[in-house]
Each structure stands twice: as C-alpha cells, then as structure tokens.
Amino acid sequence: MVDASKKWPKLRPPLSEEQQRISDDFMKHWHEVLPRRYKFVDDFNHRYPVRHAPKEFLRTLEVGAGLGEHLDYERLSTEQTKQYVALEVRSNMAQAIQKRFPNIQVVVGDCQERLPFSDGYFDRVIAVHVLEHLPILPQAIAEAYRVCDKQKGLFSVVIPCEGSLAYTLARRVSAQRHFEKRYRQSYRWFIEREHLNRPEEIITELQRHFTIIHRGFFPIPAPALFCNLCIGLTLRPKAVSEQSA
C-alpha cells in the first residue's frame, strides 16, 4: 500500500520567464473567456455553491476567487457582502476583484498556507475549480477545515472530472484551442502543471476532515466521471475526534 503522505507536496516543473508570463496571462484570460463563451458550464460551477449554501450564513471565504466571477451569482445582503472574503493568490487578479466589488474584502494569499482568520470563523467556505491545482492539497483542505464553523459551517467545492473522456474532449475544443491559438505553442506543459489532482485524490483528502452531504454531477446527473465535466460537493466539517489521519 502506498503511503499517501508521500504524495504531497506534488512537484511542479520550473517555468521559464516566458512560460510564467504565459501562465499568468492565460489564467486571467480564461477567467474572462469562460463566462462569455461557455456560460452553461460556468452556471453550474457557480450556482452549485449558491444552491447549497447554509441557511442564514453571514461570513463567506472564497478561495481561489479568480476575477470574482462567483460573486455575480450571489445575492448577498449588505452585511453578508461586508463579511465576504475573496482570497486570490495572483495580485493582478485580486486587484481586478477589488475594482469590481469594492464592498467585499479581498486578500492576496495562498490557501495552502495559514490564513489570517481565527478557528471556525466562516459559515461557508467555497472553492470553485481550485483544489485540482494545489500541490499541497492536504494542507489547503486542513486550513479550510480550521476556518470553517464546526457547528453550522459548510464547505462547497466544484472540481473538474479531470481524466474523464468527456472532460478531455471538451477541453480540446475549449481551453486547449484558446491557449494554442493565443500563444502558438503546446498546451500540454501548461495543463500538466496546473491540473495536478484527480477527482478521486481530492475526494479522499476531503473525507479526512469533512463528510460529504451532497454531490452534483454536470451535465449528466448521474454519479459517473466518464460522461461528466464537473462535480459539485457539499461538505460538513467532522468533529475533531472523527477526523482521519
């Protein structure tokens, strides 16, 4: 049996200056393109956490907030807006969020590191297409668990069906096509460096700290990977004594 602890952190190959520039540019570009060109997918990505939000929540942490696209789907009260924290690791994208949504809190930071919030501070934690990117995934999930309210909090996650037939084919005519047209080079080095974690790995790590209380599959509402593009998960924090090593 493989020791799971030896899988992490996963190592990413270093980037040249040109590759780093392309990586930063495409991440921002794709966050702009996806809502416009592939709205039917983006609707699932962002409606799922809204539909399964805890009742009467106040404080939200969104990790890997991108350009703030998820906020277009929220219907927040004035107080909920003030208590909404968008965490984004790229400063240029964080600046874009703050410009569009000046009334929320925007923090530049890495969800794999300790966050500047007390234990159990948030009623909801959201991660939309984030966990597949993380080389230190267990640490990020443990930190989401730490800041999530253990009594009433929920963790909402959306991940791609990475490796499935449907997802691979869909990517060839969407992100891969855009990337190769824009930069005139192979998409492979970019996506192999970005999508590090498969669904089964992510779910295994989530279940160490959380209990899955709902699953949603898109576009076919059947619990199968090969025919779907995305999975939505709603999770409740386990009691400290219930967590697995």
Language-model-detected regions and their locations in the chain:
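S-adenosyl-L-methionine-dependent methyltransferase catalytic module, highlighting the catalytic core
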Residues: 3-20, 25-28, 32-36, 113, ...
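Conserved alpha-helix/loop element of class I SAM-dependent methyltransferases that forms part
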Residues: 39-57, 73
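Conserved class I S-adenosyl-L-methionine
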Residues: 57-66
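Residues at the starts of beta-strands that form the adenosine-phosphate
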Residues: 59, 83, 154
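Class I SAM-dependent methyltransferase SAM/SAH-binding core
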Residues: 66-113
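A short acidic, Gly/Pro-enriched loop at the edge of an enzyme's catalytic core
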Residues: 112-124
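A short beta-strand submotif of the Rossmann-like class I SAM-dependent methyltransferase core
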Residues: 124-130
